[in-house]
Each structure stands twice: as C-alpha cells, then as structure tokens.
From Swiss-Prot:
Pfam family, one: Ribosomal_S2
Gene name of this polypeptide: rpsB
Family affiliation: Belongs to the universal ribosomal protein uS2 family.
Source species, domain of life: Bacteria
GO molecular function: structural constituent of ribosome
Organism: Bordetella avium (strain 197N)
Keywords recorded for this protein, A-Z: Ribonucleoprotein, Ribosomal protein
Record GO biological process: translation
First and last residue of the signal peptide: none
Disulfide bonds: none
HAMAP family named among the record's database cross-references: Ribosomal_uS2_B (MF_00291_B)
A GO CC annotation given for this chain: cytosolic small ribosomal subunit
Listed name of the protein: Small ribosomal subunit protein uS2
Classification via PANTHER family: 30S RIBOSOMAL PROTEIN S2 PROKARYOTIC AND ORGANELLAR, SMALL RIBOSOMAL SUBUNIT PROTEIN US2M
Length: 249
C-alpha cells in the first residue's frame, strides 16, 4: 500500500475546524469540507519523507531522538514505538527545564537508578512499612516523570513531537539549545520553531500510530546502516592488515 493511501486511511488529512486555523499553515492546506480544513497529503508525504530521511541519517551517526507525546491519544503509542527503536521518550507531563535544566533532571535520574538498585538487591525490604510506602510512592512518581529518559546520558540530538501546541515548552527549550525539532503540526498551530514539519492530523490515534511507527522505523534503519558501516570498516581494516603482513614477508 502506498504511503499516501495509508495516510488517507489513517485520516492524516483531516485538520481542525476552519475558524481555528493558523494562517501560517496555509501552504499545507488543500481546502475545506464541512467547515473542516483538509490537509494536502502530497505536501504531507513529501515533508514526512524529508523528516524520516533526517532521522535515519541522524540515527546512522549514532544520534538520539527524544520522542515526545504526552496527550492521551499519543502516550502509549509514542512510548511503545520509542522503546521498540531504543530511544528515550516523554509520555507523561513535560517538566519545564527538562532540556534547559538537564543538570537537575540528571540528579533525578541518578536517584531513580539508585532506587531501582535497592529494589533489585532486596535492600528495600529492610525498610519499615511506612518507609516502604514512601519509597514506592517516590519510585512511582519518578518513573512516571522520567522513566522514559532514564538511559539518556546527555541532551538529545533531536526531538520528535506529536502536537506542537500541546508541547510549546518542549519546542521552545529545543530552540534555545539549537536542538532540531521534527513535529506533527495540525492546521490550528504554528509551524514556527519546527525544523522538519509533518503537516497532519495530531488527534487521531491511527494517524499518530503512523507517524510514530515511521519515525521509529527510520531510527532502526539508520542504526542498521551504522552497524553495517562499522562491519565494513572492520573488514576493510583486516584486509589492509593482511596486505601489510604480506609485504613484510
């Protein structure tokens, strides 16, 4: 099935009510039907391919992409696809300063990892009942807030965002730090601050699943390319080494 057909079936082309539109999205709008803007899927396909190409190249260089989707329709889909391709994700609330104040976030990650060790080695069982309850409450809170980024050792190399209106702070923080943003932008939002725009429906679960799967697939393809490149380098290196030995003999 062609990508455009998939997008059509997932309802990617359905924008928001015309009265809520953002004029900056005009280049990506085909028209309107029953007071709802219809997104030009030819534009979406081209922009989506640009975005996945960027992600693939970034992943091939060993880069990390932070998946961001905290609204109800996106949470589970974003977390599942990020985990599938081994990337960090934020599926609960975006904490202000998650990027711009990463030093503080790192100390929370350190605490979470220490707590996980306590659970793994059984030392948590030595706590009193009250301490145990407080411990579990803190662990749950940390897991919900930063569980998806606990293996992120530094700032990400890019952000993939579902719904820029919902994640204005995340996009603004990425802009401040010069981190490229790949984002799904619906007809009611501004594409400002987004480096790789995917014009499309940001409410439908089927549409969100399509975007998240596509970005995750691009990451996996890039990673595979990276591994193949390393294998080729090693093989070439071995051949050169053998030739040097032959010359010496």
């Amino acid at each position: 099935m062609s990508l455009m057909r998939e997008m059509l079936e997932a309802g990617v082309h359905f924008g928001h009510q015309t009265r809520y539109w953002n004029p900056k999205m005009a280049p990506y709008i085909f028209g309107h039907r029953n007071k709802i803007h219809i997104i030009n899927l030819e534009q979406t396909v081209a922009k989506y391919q640009e975005a996945t190409k960027f992600v693939k190249q970034l992943a091939a260089r060993g880069g990390n992409i932070l998946f961001v989707g905290t609204k109800r329709a996106a949470r589970e889909l974003v977390a599942t696809e990020a985990e599938r391709c081994g990337m960090p994700f934020v599926d609960a609330r975006w904490l202000g300063g998650m990027l711009t104040n990463f030093k503080t976030v790192k100390s929370s990650i350190k605490r979470l990892k220490e707590m996980e060790v306590m659970v793994a080695d059984g030392s948590v069982e030595r706590l009193t009942k009250k301490e145990g309850l407080l411990f579990q409450r803190e662990l749950d809170k940390l897991n919900k807030a930063i569980g998806g980024i606990k293996d992120m050792n530094g700032l990400p190399d890019a952000l993939f965002v579902i719904d820029v209106g919902y994640h204005k702070i995340a996009v603004a923080e990425a802009r401040t730090l010069g981190i490229p943003v790949v984002a799904v932008v619906d007809t009611n939002h501004s594409p400002d601050g987004v480096d790789y725009i995917i014009p499309g429906n940001d409410d439908s679960a089927r549409a969100i699943a399509l975007y998240a799967k596509g970005i995750a697939d691009a990451v996996l393809e890039g990673r595979e390319q990276n591994l193949n490149g390393l294998v080729e380098e090693i093989v070439e290196g071995e051949e050169e080494f053998v030739e040097v030995q032959d010359g010496q003999a």
